[in-house]
Amino acid sequence: RDLYYGAADIPALPESLAALHENAAAYPRARRYYTSGLLRTEQTLEAIYGPVAHQQLPGLREMNFGDFEMKSYQELKDTAAYQAWIADVEHNVCPNGEGAPQVLERNRAAMAQVLASEEDAVCVVHGGVTAGLMMTWFGGGRYDYSVKPGTGFTVTFRDGKPVSYERVPE
């Protein structure tokens, strides 16, 4: 059952973690590692990289879906509040939650901390965070950068600016 979960601190699926561990060699290594601090990012980092030292950046957390947290499309589809939100998810705010502009600003501020160093870094973050940052850096729409759990992008920066990307794992 597909749920809206952003702020909810739910675990990753055990079978997903096992698959990540089996494919760990497909992921890039770095000198620095970051997570959002939510359990599923902590578990994902450990499944791929083992017990590596890392920093938690709460600014990299997914959207707080407010009243929609842990609810499915089926539960929400006929409500006026949900219909109002999905009419423009890039600008509207979830009741008692956040809107995409707030989340993106929070995510960008956290990424500025990561980018302050020129050392390579791995950030284990959420799909919405990934899509929002990629849209900001490379243009396009949110769905151009959709990721499944355990996938993402390697982004190359020069002089603090994003210049290219490739999907990971390939």
State what each model feature region is.
Residues 1-52, 98:
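Active-site-proximal alpha-helix that buttresses catalytic centers in soluble enzyme cores
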Residues 10, 48-106:
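Phosphate-handling substructures
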Residues 31, 117-128:
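Generic beta-sheet signal
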Residues 34, 55-57, 166:
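General small-molecule cofactor/ligand-binding pocket signal
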Residues 35-36, 105, 124-125:
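Short beta-strand scaffold positions
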Residues 40-42, 62-63, 129-132:
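Short, active-site-adjacent cap segments at secondary-structure transitions
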Residues 47, 132-136:
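Active-site signature of alpha/beta-hydrolase-fold catalytic machinery across serine-
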Residues 140-166:
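Domain-level recognition of soluble alpha/beta enzyme cores
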